């Protein structure tokens, strides 16, 4: 604790803050350049950003859009990635042979439907690698499609089914 606390506050915290600010600037520029490309990239990398806690770099962009335009397009790229991760884990149920692993699928799918994909990522798809890659591809396709169709979010809501009304 005497070592971890100062290292966390003095080294890791500032590095993550710098990375988050750089990502936010890059994402903002990409969104202005090509919304479809933005949706593709955000959808593809969303789960990786979640793993490293860098997904918070998109929230200020969405808040700024909501405040100035009344809607946010920055949220659409990440929305489909959550469902892609959930679908990949649900599909794993039919491929898994180990009953202990199969028992993890239902709780991960339920939490994924509600917008919390960490159990699906860390418990099932990341250890198997292929489902994680397929969920990234699905997230990219859905992110590009949703931004191409002009999907907007009018309020800050969660991911998953509870975010659909927003």
Could you describe each region identified by the protein language model?
Residues 51-102, 165:
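Membrane-interfacial helix-loop connectors
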Residues 1-47, 162-166:
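Signature of multi-pass transmembrane helix bundles
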Residues 32, 36, 61, 99-100, ...:
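Transmembrane alpha-helical segments and their short flanking loops
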Residues 12, 29-32, 36, 46, ...:
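Conserved helix-loop functional segments at active or binding sites
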Residues 10-23, 54-59, 90-95, 118, ...:
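Transmembrane helix-loop junctions in multi-pass membrane proteins
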Residues 8, 42-55, 66-72, 111-114, ...:
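Transmembrane alpha-helix interface/packing and boundary motifs in multi-pass membrane proteins
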Residues 11-16, 34, 49-57, 80-83, ...:
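Short helix-coil transition sites and intra-membrane helix breaks within transmembrane domains
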Residues 4, 8, 38, 42, ...:
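Alpha-helical transmembrane segments in multi-pass membrane proteins
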């Amino acid at each position: 604790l005497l070592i971890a606390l100062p290292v966390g506050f003095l080294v890791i915290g500032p590095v993550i803050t710098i990375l988050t600010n750089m990502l936010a600037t890059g994402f903002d520029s990409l969104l202005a350049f090509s919304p479809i490309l933005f949706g593709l990239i955000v959808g593809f990398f969303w789960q990786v950003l979640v793993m490293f806690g860098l997904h918070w770099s998109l929230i200020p962009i969405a808040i700024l859009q909501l405040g100035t335009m009344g809607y946010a397009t920055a949220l659409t790229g990440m929305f489909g990635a959550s469902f892609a991760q959930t679908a990949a884990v649900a599909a794993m149920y039919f491929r898994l042979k180990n009953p202990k692993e199969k028992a993890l699928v239902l709780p991960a799918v339920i939490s994924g439907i509600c917008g919390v994909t960490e159990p699906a990522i860390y418990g099932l798809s990341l250890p198997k690698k292929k489902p994680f890659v397929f969920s990234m591809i699905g997230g990219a396709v859905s992110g590009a499609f949703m931004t191409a169709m002009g999907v907007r979010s009018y309020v800050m809501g969660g991911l998953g089914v509870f975010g659909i009304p927003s």
